[in-house]
Amino acid sequence: MKKFRGTFTVMITPFSGDGFKINFDSLEKFIDWQIRQGIHGLIGLGSTGEFLSLNEEERYNVSKRIIDRTDGKVPVLIGTGAENTWDVIRYSREAELLGADGVMIIPPFYSTPTENELFNHFKKVADSISIPIMLYNNPATANVDLTPDIVKHLSEIDNVSYIKESTMDVTRVRDIIRLCEDKMTVFGGIMGYESFLNGALGWVAVGSNIMPSEFAKLFKLSVINKNIDEARSIYKNIFPIIE
């Protein structure tokens, strides 16, 4: 099982000019370019990929094309979030059968589940697949906040082993690492650079759709080389994209 580290682009989904069809030629070219630019991983069908705007056939076809085109060169995660647990299970099984290295799952975003309901939801999904689950915490869009204490509870599920922590509070990165220890690897969301400084080992980045090389380099300088001064210089250059 691959370990996920580095900057992962949460990918756009290219459409035709009229907005009615997915542009698969552009999608393949985009994947090739991302890999050439040195990105460490790709995530399809996240919020940036407009997963809620796609029907089931489109979700399947986009997932398959991303996985096939990447061809193992970098890890691929597929967003399999849905309101219904059984839909999440179906999408997640499908992603695994297609060859995804993992799935990224936002909590049910309308029903505001309790902590125990969240645990049961993710436990049922985890029991249905053998690849890792990356939790996606974005309370601004999901209407659910996976607090560090809840994440600790969810980390008791064997293959719930990653989280995209996408609030503006980077102290959560520190707290999740402290509470979960080696059971949970934290990826920053919006605050990638700041998350690295607090111990995150990855970044699920939107801006790397535009500047993959620079976003990947920021991870290397911050986490691998520990060259904070040079990392800060790159961060200043890419901040307008992040903002």
For each predicted feature, which ranges?
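Active-site beta->alpha loop and helix N-cap motifs at the rims of alpha/beta catalytic domains
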Residues: K2-D145, V151
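Catalytic alpha/beta core domains of metabolic enzymes, predominantly
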Residues: D127-S128, P139-E243
